[in-house]
Amino acid sequence: MKTFSAKASEASRKWWVIDARDQVLGKVAVKAANLLRGKEKTVFTPHVDTGDFVIVINANKVRLTGKKEEQKTFMSFSGYVGGHKSENVRARRVRHPELLVERAVRGMIPHNRLGRRVYRKLKVYSGDSHPHAAQQPEVVKLTGK
């Protein structure tokens, strides 16, 4: 019996919607990363993009555990003297709420060419509407609160 290896051209792609309202950020990110990579399919092959498209809505209402809202900081550096900037999750949520989910999912997929291709299939929106109704996405139910 030969080992099966999927081909990216033969992969069937579905569209999924994850509602992040009152869901823990890590649980949303794990589910999105697994769907993006195709880990929940029987034809999963680690070096081939067999994953689906994922839409995450209500990214501004995602929940964080503990005191991360005030204590977790995002650092950036412009390259200039005195160019260090930092902001906590609360400030980041006001400016760019979708970046919280995008960064969490990005950390859970491979950091290589395949990971970049997979990451492009993630669509994150801060509101409860999205422009992908024509793709007829299916709703993903997350367990727990």
Task: For each feature predicted by the language model, list its residue ranges.
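Ribosome large-subunit tunnel/peptidyl-transferase-proximal elements
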Residues: 1-103, 113, 126, 131-145
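Short conserved catalytic/interaction loops centered on acidic-Pro-aromatic/His motifs
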Residues: 112-118
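Hydrophobic, well-ordered secondary-structure segments
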Residues: 101-102, 106, 119
